[in-house]
Amino acid sequence: MILVIDNYDSFTYNLVHYVGDFGAEVEVRRNDDIDVRDALDLQPEKIIISPGPCTPKEAGISEALILASTVPVLGVCLGHQAIGSAFGGQVVKAPSIHHGKISSIQHDGTQIFEHIASPCKVVRYHSLVVAKDSLPEELLITATLEDNADVIMG
């Protein structure tokens, strides 16, 4: 089962449907509707932290669950920022705001990017990013903007 933490964003269910299309069992819980212990007691194989309209510090159990998890965690938008923040990275305003804008990213071809060409086009919906120079050693950068390698995309 894949546990999706919903940070009150309409895009959450797009993710749920995409994951479901691959045959995965998905359970969705709101970020303030479950605590970390109960989330881990569900024994998810993977966790997805969804986008949302707030900062990582305001995203319920997101950061605490990231730190407590022993299974792979995928963070999308706010979830990505929460991973960086949970490990001590700084979340800052993006160099430019991109809501519904297409950008090219380059990636290392590993894991989630394994069968995706690099560079590739993605749609961005965020105004905050994890500052590259604040990223702790525990986290590896797997994707950046093609035209600005300082903007982390994975």
Which residues does each predicted region cover?
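N-terminal beta1-alpha1 cap of cysteine-dependent amidohydrolase-like domains
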Residues: 1-68, 78
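Structured catalytic cores of enzymes that bind and process phosphorylated ligands/cofactors
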Residues: 8-15, 19, 26, 73, ...
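Short loop/helix-cap segments at secondary-structure boundaries that form the rim of catalytic
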Residues: 20, 39-41, 83-85, 132-136
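Generic structural signal for residues in well-ordered beta-strands
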Residues: 26-28, 91, 141
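Cysteine-nucleophile active-site neighborhood
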Residues: 44-114, 119
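Catalytic beta-strand/loop cores that center a nucleophilic Ser/Cys/Thr
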Residues: 111-154
